[in-house]
């Protein structure tokens, strides 16, 4: 990483600076030999490597083996920025683990959290966030569907 001046921005803590430098060094060593001719296989391999490197620990809270007590947006942004500089596919693989685990962390039942979050962190399950609606596609902010309770269930 040639320009590190952004790490001096006031909203980054020393731990964020250490994270950025450590990930950049790791990515230089671990992302240079990914064969992306088979994108699905490459993504699975990237998730495996990200888990082995401890980077997926940032996708889940500490209660499920994660790096921090709560998900930290600054850490997630730094990780994505650095991974994207090294490999767009590595950024994609990391982003999907985070996008899929975020809603489970925030609103999942205890049983779902116990089942999925540790496995996502270890790279044993590939997380996803999927939705679609006519006129909105995958734009969450444009969703128009509503729900209303009908009965006691």
Q: Where are the regions a protein language model picked out?
A:
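Intrinsic disorder at enzyme termini
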Residues: 1-18
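Short loop/turn motifs at secondary-structure junctions and domain boundaries
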Residues: 2-3, 39, 136-139
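Residue-level recognition of alpha-helical structural elements
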Residues: 12, 39-43, 112-113
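Hydrophobic alpha-helical scaffolding
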Residues: 13, 36-37, 69, 106
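Extended amphipathic alpha-helical segments enriched in small hydrophobics
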Residues: 19-23
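Short secondary-structure junction/hinge motifs that connect adjacent elements
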Residues: 28-54, 64-68
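Internal helix-loop-helix
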Residues: 52-124
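Glycine-rich, Trp-frequent "lid" loop and neighboring beta-strands that shape
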Residues: 66-69, 111-153
């Amino acid at each position: 990483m040639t320009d590190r001046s952004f790490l001096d921005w006031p909203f980054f803590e020393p731990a964020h600076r250490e994270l950025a430098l450590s990930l950049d060094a790791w990515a230089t060593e671990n992302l240079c030999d990914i064969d992306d001719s088979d994108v699905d296989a490459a993504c699975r391999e990237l998730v495996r490597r990200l888990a082995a490197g401890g980077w997926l620990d940032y996708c889940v809270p500490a209660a499920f083996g994660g790096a921090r007590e709560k998900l930290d947006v600054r850490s997630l942004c730094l990780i994505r920025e650095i991974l994207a500089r090294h490999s767009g596919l590595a950024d994609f693989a990391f982003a999907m683990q985070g996008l899929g685990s975020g809603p489970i962390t925030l609103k999942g039942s205890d049983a779902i959290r116990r089942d999925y979050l540790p496995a996502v962190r270890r790279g044993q399950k590939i997380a996803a966030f999927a939705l679609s609606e006519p006129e909105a596609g995958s734009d969450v902010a444009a969703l128009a569907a509503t729900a209303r309770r009908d009965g006691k269930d």
